[in-house]
């Protein structure tokens, strides 16, 4: 499988082109990775309007993952969590999301920004501040107590300690 982004960046770094673009270090080594640190320059594609090497790389990743489509994102999990919640609540009529207590902090800000009603799943037992073991029974009881199905159920699994929901 070809690696369009890595190949482009390697070629660009090796070209010793004068950089009149961001980032400000201009590719001069300080930590060692600067020659490969670029922005949306000609040929590098644009993440949110991918048509070139990023689109090709996403297509390759999708084939590797066996998914219909793969989209790269910035900001780690936070942006993806916000997008997921937005899509979940705009796809249906419910603004309720059921969530375990060990959620990512981006969930809290997304829930506030989207004005969601969060129904918390309480673990049957808690062995730590980070763990939140949720059983199938616990989830079924919570869902059956709701007047209507939620827009989504948000579980972190495996959790930060390796526990599975």
Model-derived regions, located:
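Conserved N-terminal alpha-helix of the aminotransferase class I/II PLP-enzyme fold
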Residues: 34-79
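Active-site phosphate-binding strand-loop segment of PLP-dependent enzymes
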Residues: 128-165
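Conserved beta-loop-alpha segment that forms the PLP phosphate-binding cup at the N-terminus of a helix
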Residues: 69-94, 105-110
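Gly/Ser/Thr-rich loops at beta-strand to alpha-helix junctions
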Residues: 54, 75-80, 103-105, 158-162
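Short, acidic/turn-prone active-site loops that include or flank metal/cofactor-
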Residues: 102-105, 122-128
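Substrate-binding/gating loop at the entrance of the active-site cleft, primarily
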Residues: 99-117
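N-terminal "arm"/small-domain region of PLP-dependent enzymes with the aminotransferase-like
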Residues: 1-52
């Amino acid at each position: 499988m070809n690696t369009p982004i890595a190949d482009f960046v390697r070629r660009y770094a090796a070209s010793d082109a004068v950089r009149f673009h961001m980032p400000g270090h201009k590719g001069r080594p300080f930590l060692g990775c600067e020659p490969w640190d670029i922005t949306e320059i000609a040929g590098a594609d644009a993440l949110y309007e991918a048509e070139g090497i990023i689109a090709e790389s996403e297509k390759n990743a999708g084939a590797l993952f066996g998914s219909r489509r793969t989209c790269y994102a910035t900001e780690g999990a936070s942006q993806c969590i916000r997008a997921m919640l937005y899509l979940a609540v705009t796809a249906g009529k419910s603004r309720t999301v059921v969530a375990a207590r060990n959620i990512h902090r981006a969930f809290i800000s997304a829930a506030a920004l989207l004005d969601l009603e969060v129904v918390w799943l309480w673990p049957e037992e808690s062995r730590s501040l980070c763990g939140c073991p949720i059983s199938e029974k616990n989830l079924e009881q919570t869902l059956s107590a709701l007047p209507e199905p939620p827009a989504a159920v948000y579980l972190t699994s495996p959790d930060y300690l390796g526990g599975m929901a």
